[in-house]
Amino acid sequence: MFKTPVSVLVVIHTPDLQVLLLERADHPGYWQSVTGSQNPDETLLQTAVREVAEETGLDATRYPLTALTNWNIQNRYEIFQEWRWRYAPGVTHNTEHVFGLMLSNPLAVTLAPKEHLQYVWLSWQAAAEKVFSSSNAEAIRKLALRNF
């Protein structure tokens, strides 16, 4: 089954703007926030909750309703050639929907070893510099402008 070319990006952060980053297992040195494709018959919010659980072991539903928010930001980008085999033939672009998950403080997370090698909590400035994706960097920079 092919992936749907719709995904979520979930920036996990604290009130003082520390940001959780994960290092990709399939590309060591590529750091990112939680990301993942939407499954059929799944809402974007359900996708965000599922991806956070799969990639960090955190249950986003255990936090206040205001902790996980849809930032109403969409990014359309070209799918890297090396990852296009995951999508139906002819699919070249993905639409990413940005969410934030605010935790009261940095937490230890449980990584999915096939997906990520390690994690780190960084200031928003350092996190924006470290991520490989420009849309991820932009979302982290926008974090500093949000009112919590």
Regions found by a protein language model. Name each.
Residues 1-19, 40:
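Conserved N-terminal beta-strand and adjoining loop/helix that marks the start
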Residues 27-29:
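A conserved beta-turn-beta hairpin within the catalytic core of GNAT-like acetyltransferases
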Residues 32-35:
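A short gly/proline-enriched turn/hairpin at secondary-structure junctions
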Residues 38-134:
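Unchanged
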Residues 145-148:
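Generic C-terminal helix-cap and adjacent flexible tail
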Residues 139-143:
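A small-molecule sensor/coupling module
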Residues 21-24:
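Short, acidic/hydrophobic/Gly-rich beta-strand patch recurrent on exposed beta strands
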